[in-house]
Amino acid sequence: MTIDTAAWPAGRVNSLGFAKPPHETRVVAAMSGGVDSSVVAAMLKAEGYDVIGITLQLYDHGAAIEKKGACCAGQDIHDARNVSDAIGIPHYVLDYESRFREQVMEDFADTYLSGSTPIPCIRCNQTVKFADLLATAKELGADCLATGHYIRRTDGPEGPELHRAQDASRDQSYFLFATTRAQLDFLRFPLGSLPKSEVRELAEKFALQVAAKPDSQDICFVPDGSYAKVVEKLRPGSGRGGEIVHLDGRVLGKHEGVIHYTIGQRRGLGVATGDPLFVVKIDAPARRVIVGPREALMTRGLLLEELNWLGQGSLEEAATHGARVLIRVRSTRPPVPGRLGYEDGVPAVFFDAPEEGVARGQAAVLYDLEGSTRILGGGFIARPLPADERVVAA
């Protein structure tokens, strides 16, 4: 069903926040070929917007055609094109393989080699989707770029704000903390207030061929879940072995490369001591994997880098005054209370109670402590601050 836009009252704001009728509002819909982005395009078209669909070809098109659960490659490009044809909008495919490899895949490999644990989906949003694609949308004369992310954007007193999705089980705020205010001004997230079940129903209502398509899973360019294989392919010779060392200094065994390990890992260590051991630190330059008891995983705080602040006032003011925040260190964990501050002049967050198994390279996302859904920003973890001094000295 379409909306009659023939008579549009002066000053009336459309569903995307513009004071003009939908047919005068150009929207670029980022289409990955999945259900969510397809529903966004169909919804906007049904409301009468001037919609253009764009899909980014991000990696090895040929090898990815048969891969299930990927995005932005192979069959997904065909699906996005077919959906666009079905709903009657123009569709374009932009080849961003080189850009994606340079900004996302190369960074992924180098981050693992440094002993950190990367989050390529954040890098992709930050350096490709919300940078290059957004710029392309503006070049096409679009008023905004709409995506299928489960997150909400609202207009606040200091500009656009980012809020958690209505459906907590689908909330993607952890992966979108790096979105800047300038980007938020141009972005729209039509699914932020909808549960996934309703999105599936809409896909069926619009008779989209992707209505029953599974959600994308894992990292799109890691076909079998083996991160180490991808790193080895991008950085031949990266699997150089070294020692597995206990916190007390004992050498317990050998490993085949730090790229096979992450903080908090217990399985696959290949050492037997009778007591449960976990990876508590990775010394990449020395090629040492340091293990210890579970209590050695506890972290009192985190030094942050590339910090993006979306809260009130400036980051400097918030950190200087020790602003109280909620901190999320993994997408699967609930946020925990703490405060902003500085450690040795570097922006940091400090937990009210020590947090377990926090890895360098992951994200620390900040939320409003006062029960609201607002995302205050976040940063990448430059260095955890261990509660156990043995880990500091190791």
From Swiss-Prot:
It holds the Pfam family tRNA_Me_trans_M. Keywords: ATP-binding, Cytoplasm, Disulfide bond, Nucleotide-binding, RNA-binding, Transferase, tRNA processing, tRNA-binding. ATP binds at residues 30-37, 56, 148. Residues 170-172 are annotated as: Interaction with tRNA. Its main location: cytoplasm. Disulfide bonds join 124-220. Its EC number is 2.8.1.13. Coiled coil: none annotated. The record marks 149, 362 as: Interaction with tRNA. GO terms for cellular component: cytoplasm. The active site is at residues 124, 220. It is found in: Cytoplasm. One of its GO terms (molecular function) is ATP binding. Signal peptide: none annotated. Catalyzes the 2-thiolation of uridine at the wobble position (U34) of tRNA, leading to the formation of s(2)U34. Belongs to the MnmA/TRMU family. This is tRNA-specific 2-thiouridylase MnmA. It comes from Hyphomonas neptunium (strain ATCC 15444). The gene is mnmA.
